[in-house]
Amino acid sequence: MEMTADYLRDRAWQYAQLTRLNRPIGNFLLLWPMLWGLWIAAKGLPDLKVLVVFVLGVLIMRAAGCVINDYADRDFDGHVKRTTHRPMANGRVSEREALTLFVVLCLVAFGLVLLMNPLTIALSLVAVALAATYPFMKRYTHFPQVHLGAAFGWAIPMAFAAQTGAVAPVAWLLFLSAVLWATIYDTQYAMVDRDDDLKIGVKSTAVLFGQADRAIIGVLQGVMLAVLVAAGLVVGLGAFWYLGLAAAAALFAYQQWLIRERRREDCFRAFLNNNWLGGLIFLGLLLDLHLGG
């Protein structure tokens, strides 16, 4: 096929959609927990090289995760209202293109992590395995959201390893909070697709929880906040940290109000609201580390 400007422009747009460059919310949901971990590991002053590598690595691996997700779901997405427009669902990107792009993105991310220490490099192999296997979990288990949380949260122990050369116990508390958080917001996200998922046999926590979804999400929200309180106690954080958590609790209450009738658009709004929640927790951490004395 002739490489005309129009063709290249079209390919770039298809790949941008495939990697969700047009939907940056996922970038933030990945970045916030990593930033919590890195700032706590560094006591407020992260190494610039580590910060740059991790921000770029998170963005690249999120793009790779979106690609392999669409590859795995290529036969399902055409039957789900929200995903019928995706490039693989309507044949605008081939399977070979998608797999090639996934491999290239993973290699670029691995090239970045090679700038880090051996422990971080070893942990990165787990990150790739989690990212590559997550999209297939919905065929075999009702808990793909938990797997997603592990994939999203794995940047936390990696950040500790890169910054300090070790993974402190508090890193695993933060990792647990990230798993819980992803389970919360991805269940809200899955509530948008629940009717379609039931028809085509796709598993999710939203399908499993059924009418108990709001109550279970509420329990998970409470446990997540308790874990973050424990993390703050372990490292001696002060008032600003807990003010950030109080703000997060208020947003969790708002999300419960949004999903009260389980309308698709309101469940999606609750999902999007988590970006503000992650940012407020990070703001509380920043203020505490730099102004808390």
From Swiss-Prot:
**Gene Ontology terms describing biological process:** ubiquinone biosynthetic process
Keywords, in A-Z order: Cell inner membrane, Cell membrane, Magnesium, Membrane, Transferase, Transmembrane, Transmembrane helix, Ubiquinone biosynthesis
Q: What is its EC number?
A: 2.5.1.39
Q: What is its main location?
A: membrane
> Which regions form coiled coils?
none
Residue ranges crossing the lipid bilayer per the database entry: 25-45, 48-68, 101-121, 142-162, 165-185, 223-243, 271-291
| InterPro entries for the chain | HB_polyprenyltransferase-like (IPR006370), Prenyltransferase (IPR039653), UbiA_prenyltransferase (IPR000537), UbiA_prenylTrfase_CS (IPR030470), UbiA_sf (IPR044878)
UniProt-listed Pfam families: UbiA
The entry's localization annotation reads: Cell inner membrane
Pathway(s) served: Cofactor biosynthesis; ubiquinone biosynthesis
| Uppermost EC category | transferase
Q: Which reaction does it catalyse?
A: all-trans-octaprenyl diphosphate + 4-hydroxybenzoate = 4-hydroxy-3-(all-trans-octaprenyl)benzoate + diphosphate
Q: Which GO terms describe its cellular component?
A: plasma membrane
MF terms from GO for this chain are:
4-hydroxybenzoate polyprenyltransferase activity
Q: How does it sit in the membrane?
A: Multi-pass membrane protein
Cofactor(s) listed: Mg(2+)
| CDD domains referenced in this protein's UniProt entry, alphabetically | PT_UbiA_COQ2 (cd13959)
Family listed: Belongs to the UbiA prenyltransferase family.
Q: Which NCBIfam families match?
A: ubiA_proteo
HAMAP family in the cross-refs: UbiA (MF_01635)
Q: What does this protein do?
A: Catalyzes the prenylation of para-hydroxybenzoate (PHB) with an all-trans polyprenyl group. Mediates the second step in the final reaction sequence of ubiquinone-8 (UQ-8) biosynthesis, which is the condensation of the polyisoprenoid side chain with PHB, generating the first membrane-bound Q intermediate 3-octaprenyl-4-hydroxybenzoate.
Write the protein's name: 4-hydroxybenzoate octaprenyltransferase
**Whose protein is this, by species?**
Alkalilimnicola ehrlichii (strain ATCC BAA-1101 / DSM 17681 / MLHE-1)
Gene this chain is encoded by: ubiA
